[in-house]
């Protein structure tokens, strides 16, 4: 009974002269009687009935209340403005309830702890809004690294919001890429960079190259799709060509190579290309490049490459010149190739040499009826007698 009276006296003393840390420490030392509330909690109860608590009192009340698992009381007093919020109180509450700690930090105006709580509770969209409102500038890179480690998917969303902020990027794009790749998060890094680089700016060439590099090494089909969409224009083309070749993306490699030695090395693998695409590709090359590449294809693997070489020779016969193509096939003694190539152009040609070489190739490949037809129907049949003597010695 005496303790109860003493508690009331201390709690209601004029101008709070007895409302001191020393009083609190003394009451904490008083044993609790069975079936009663501890003296210190009785003291705080009287204070809460008549006023609100100061910083020190709030801390000393929070400790036993939270220890007893009665955080709902703390929430009630917080809403009633009965306790004074501080960073120290937030730190105590944080080990029990992150959202309640967030409320404390917000009221106490502790920006760094508020931002940390937003991150811990997954409220990433609120971080930038809050920071701008209170004029606080967090270390967004460090914050992002923390978010990415906890939740990579939300980290990607948060990263995009940081670099596309209305007031300008809040974190460097390359720094963000480093953060994702340091965690080996290739998919998230790709998703982020595709969004961040969508404007296809000249100053982003190095990042375009990096995006393609990481996918050519780790996910070639993704790189193939990106290149196929023609999204970027400023990356290191020779570097990407080389990596595409190593990844087995021969078409992409050939699209990017400009050096003839590189073109010849890749084009010989005709079995790895869509034939129609490969034929169209030769339309981009000069005459000398085309002939050099065709020679290399026949030299490397005639059995594999002859069919597409014939198609290319046929498509670009007028440009490359029949005499040079005839010479090419003859240099490899490919009368089959010569027969199929000339067979596609002979009916449109007025060159006696073409008709003669076709007849000769047909003979060498056993196409007797075709020999008879061309000799019978060719308008240039009589011209064959004017062929030079060395050539006519070859039996037809």
Predicted regions and their residues:
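Extended alpha-helical assembly domains of large eukaryotic scaffold proteins
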Residues: 1-388, 392
């Amino acid at each position: 009974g005496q303790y109860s009276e003493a508690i009331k006296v201390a709690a209601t003393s004029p101008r709070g002269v007895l409302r001191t840390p020393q009083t609190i420490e003394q009451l904490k030392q008083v044993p609790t009687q069975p079936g009663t509330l501890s003296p210190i909690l009785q003291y705080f109860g009287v204070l809460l009935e008549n006023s609100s608590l100061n910083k020190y009192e709030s801390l000393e009340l929070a400790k036993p209340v939270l220890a007893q698992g009665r955080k709902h009381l703390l929430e009630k007093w917080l809403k009633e403005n009965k306790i004074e919020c501080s960073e120290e109180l937030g730190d105590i509450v944080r080990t029990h309830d992150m959202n309640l700690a967030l409320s404390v930090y917000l009221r106490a105006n502790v920006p760094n702890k508020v931002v940390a709580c937003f991150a811990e509770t997954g409220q990433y969209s609120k971080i930038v809004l809050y920071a701008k409102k209170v004029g606080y500038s967090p270390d967004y890179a460090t914050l992002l690294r923390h978010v990415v480690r906890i939740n990579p998917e939300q980290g990607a969303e948060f990263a995009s919001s940081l670099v596309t902020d209305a007031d300008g990027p809040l974190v460097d794009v390359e720094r963000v890429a480093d953060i994702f790749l340091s965690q080996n998060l290739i998919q998230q890094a790709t998703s982020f960079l595709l969004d961040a680089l969508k404007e296809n700016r000249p100053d982003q060439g190095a990042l375009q190259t990096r995006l393609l590099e990481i996918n050519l090494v780790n996910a070639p089909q993704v790189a193939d799709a990106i290149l196929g969409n023609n999204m970027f224009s400023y990356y290191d083309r020779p570097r990407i060509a080389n990596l595409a070749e190593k990844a087995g993306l021969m078409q992409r490699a050939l699209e990017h190579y400009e050096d003839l030695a590189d073109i010849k090395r890749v084009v010989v693998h005709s079995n790895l290309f869509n034939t129609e695409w490969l034929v169209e590709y030769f339309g981009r090359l000069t005459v000398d490049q085309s002939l050099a590449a065709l020679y290399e294809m026949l030299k490397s693997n005639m059995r594999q490459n002859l069919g597409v070489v014939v198609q290319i020779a046929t498509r670009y016969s007028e440009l490359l010149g029949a005499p040079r193509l005839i010479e090419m096939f003859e240099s490899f003694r490919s009368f089959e190739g010569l027969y199929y190539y000339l067979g596609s152009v002979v009916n449109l040609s007025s060159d006696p040499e073409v008709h003669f070489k076709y007849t000769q190739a047909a003979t060498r490949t056993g196409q007797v009826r075709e020999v008879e037809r061309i000799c019978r129907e060719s308008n240039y049949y009589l011209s064959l007698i004017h062929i030079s003597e060395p050539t006519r010695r070859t039996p037809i």
